[in-house]
Each structure stands twice: as C-alpha cells, then as structure tokens.
C-alpha cells in the first residue's frame, strides 16, 4: 500500500519533502526523516530522467514514498516514471477535465486507463501480484495553477482515476495578477486556495499544496489539507547556510 494512501485511510494528512537538487545521498537522507513522501521536482529543476531513476530508489530505501512532479502532463513520461518506481505523480498545469483525464489514463492499466504494462521496479516491490493492486499503489494529483483551472475545478475533480488536486500557489497568484509568492497572504489568492480545498473535499477528493516553510505547512495542515510539502531542499540548504554564516560572523 502507498504510504500516503495509508495516511489518508487512517485519517491523517501526509507531509512531504521536496527535491530540486539532483543526487541520491541527500534524497535518501531526507527520506529517512519524518516525511511520508519525498517529491522530486522535474519541472523547475535540472533533474533529468537519468538522475531521477536512482533518486526514486534512494527515497524508497530511506523509507518515504517516492513522488515526482513531472515536467508536463504527458502520458509517456508519466508511465516511464511509474515503471521506474514513482508511486506518486503530480502533474502540472491541469486546466480542464480533458487534461485531468489524460493524467488519469496514464496512471491506470486497462480497463480503467491506458497505462502500458512494464512495471520493472514496482514488480520488485510488489511481486507477481502487482497488476491486481497497481491502482492502489499509485497516487495521482492534478495541479491547479491558473484562473482557467479554478473555473473548471468541479469538472477536474469529477474525473475518476485521480486522487485529487495539488495547488501551485506561485503560478496561481501570478495568473490572478499578484506577485508569485509561495506562502502568500494576498486575499484573492487565499480565497481561491480555500475554494479549491472546499470543492475537493465536497467531491470526496484529496487536496494538497506546496508550502515554503514549516510554519506555513503547519497552518495548511490545520486548515485540513491532505498532502502538504514544506520547503524545497535548495531553500533549506540556503537558509541553513545563511544561519551558519551569521553565527560564524557574530563577533
């Protein structure tokens, strides 16, 4: 069973790390912390497929569920990542029901979807019984990042085969005419985020959000979000380095 899905089945939200730097060592190190999942960001990072495959192994070895935010909502890319051992897919810029259906079809085998059969790494974890439980091992979230997606939110949420939606607050803020801040307090953006959360839960779906800090993640967890990421690795590295430098220079 997918660890994130286990959290949800037990009535708990899932907390995830976020990786923008390539490499297996720090991927495993983060996965060994108290994260339920670790997301590899292939959209806004230099990480390519040759790098992501061993990172998926490292995250699984560390004990967290390996997720990927894909470059685009492309079925061939999604299927390849699933075969490489991704157990969660976050697809960017899903604006319509048709685009959500594209994501859903890539996540599931026939008759529920169009995923091609070749689960090289999943079959190592789940054995010969993988096909029968494949849909339960994968979590699929469609990113809500535009005014168009907001207008179509109920249609997107009506798609069978996706678990829910994941809010990208910076692109959403930008498309609504505001500064692209992660932990935004802009009233229109805050209202839009709350609306997505409410519509998702009304539809019986899960809702996640990207957060830039642990404090903001705590707020979103308290608000009822089901899947929350808290600060990417590069931001945490920079913040820690700034603090070390400040401590060293505090003469």
Curated annotation (Swiss-Prot):
Mg(2+) binds at residues 145, 171. 3-hydroxypyruvate binds at residues 69, 170-171. The record marks 83 as: Increases basicity of active site His. Keywords: Cobalt, Lyase, Magnesium, Manganese, Metal-binding, Plasmid, Pyruvate, Zinc. The keyword Manganese applies. It holds the Pfam family HpcH_HpaI. The record marks 210 as: Improves activity by CH-pi interactions. One of its GO terms (molecular function) is metal ion binding. It comes from the Bacteria. Optimum pH is 6.75. Disulfide bonds: none annotated. The active site is at 44 (proton acceptor). The record marks 69 as: Transition state stabilizer. Belongs to the HpcH/HpaI aldolase family. Aldolase which can catalyze in vitro the aldolisation reaction between hydroxypyruvate (HPA) or pyruvate (PA) and D-glyceraldehyde (D-GA). The condensation of hydroxypyruvate and D-glyceraldehyde produces 2-dehydro-D-galactonate as the major product. The condensation of pyruvate and D-glyceraldehyde produces 2-dehydro-3-deoxy-L-galactonate. Can use other electrophilic substrates such as L-glyceraldehyde, D- and L-lactaldehyde and D-erythrose. Also catalyzes the retro-aldol type decarboxylation of oxaloacetate, a general property of known pyruvate aldolases. This is Hydroxypyruvate/pyruvate aldolase. It comes from Rhizorhabdus wittichii (strain DSM 6014 / CCUG 31198 / JCM 15750 / NBRC 105917 / EY 4224 / RW1) (Sphingomonas wittichii).
């Amino acid at each position: 069973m997918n660890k994130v899905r286990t959290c949800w089945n037990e009535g708990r939200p899932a907390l995830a790390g976020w990786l923008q730097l390539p490499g297996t060592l720090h991927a495993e190190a983060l996965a060994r912390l108290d994260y339920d999942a670790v997301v590899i960001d292939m959209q806004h990072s230099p990480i390519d497929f040759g790098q992501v495959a061993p990172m998926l192994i490292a995250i699984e070895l560390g004990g967290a569920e390996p997720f990927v935010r894909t470059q685009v909502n492309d079925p061939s890319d999604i299927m390849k990542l699933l075969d490489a051992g991704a157990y969660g897919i976050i697809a960017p810029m899903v604006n319509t029901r048709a685009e959500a259906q594209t994501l859903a079809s890539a996540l599931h085998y026939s008759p529920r979807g169009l995923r091609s059969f070749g689960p090289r790494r999943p079959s190592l974890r789940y054995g010969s019984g993988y096909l029968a439980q494949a849909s339960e091992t994968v979590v699929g979230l469609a990113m809500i990042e535009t005014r168009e997606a907001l207008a179509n939110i109920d249609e997107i949420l009506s798609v069978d085969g996706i678990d829910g939606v994941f809010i990208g607050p910076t692109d959403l803020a930008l498309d609504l005419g505001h500064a692209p801040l992660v932990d935004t307090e802009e009233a229109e953006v805050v209202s839009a985020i709350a609306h997505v959360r409410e519509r998702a839960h009304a539809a019986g779906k899960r809702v996640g959000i990207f957060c830039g800090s642990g404090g903001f993640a705590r707020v979103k967890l308290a608000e009822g979000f089901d899947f929350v990421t808290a600060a990417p690795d590069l931001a945490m590295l920079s913040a820690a380095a700034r603090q070390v430098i400040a401590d060293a220079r505090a003469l």
